[in-house]
UniProtKB/Swiss-Prot annotation:
Protein name: Large ribosomal subunit protein eL21
Task of the protein: Component of the large ribosomal subunit. The ribosome is a large ribonucleoprotein complex responsible for the synthesis of proteins in the cell.
Name of a matching Pfam family: Ribosomal_L21e
One GO biological process term: translation
Organism domain of life: Eukaryota
A GO CC annotation given for this chain: ribonucleoprotein complex
Region (Disordered): 112-145
Source species of the chain: Chinchilla lanigera (Long-tailed chinchilla)
Assembly notes: Component of the large ribosomal subunit.
Family: Belongs to the eukaryotic ribosomal protein eL21 family.
Keywords, sorted A to Z: Cytoplasm, Endoplasmic reticulum, Ribonucleoprotein, Ribosomal protein
InterPro entries with a match to the protein in the record: Ribosomal_eL21, Ribosomal_eL21_CS, Ribosomal_eL21_sf, Translation_prot_SH3-like_sf
Amino acid sequence: MTNTKGKRRGTRYMFSRPYRKHGVVPLATYMRIYKKGDIVDIKGMGTVQKGMPHKCYHGKTGRVYNVTQHAVGIVVNKQVKGKILAKRINVRIEHIKHSKSRDSFLKRVKENDQKKKEAKEKGTWVQLKRQPAPPREAHFVRTNGKEPELLEPIPYEFMA
């Protein structure tokens, strides 16, 4: 038997609700405010069929470019064969949530501003760039009175 070509083909688990989360959608979902330029994550909610994104956008992150009463317009990158296209989709707000991908960056910006301000008051220079983790410090290994054992590979012997 061939595969069907429906819009929701292969979404048995993708659009299903988590355990003990079936039924009415919490009101907090509708209370969230979305503005132009917000970064949002797309995640289809099976309880609401209206305004549901296509399965190919599930789990993607996009930027809000338009806001209406019940839905938002989102720009999402989608790979089509060899190229990546910026697709504009309209999705109801039940199927999106604010992304946490920028939180760490914004937190770092805030910390850097604070460091700059303190350095300016003191008249010193401060390192703002993130540094890779340095090599670990040298340390001694305790042997507890035992001599270290020298390990050597067994010499290769050809057996015919």
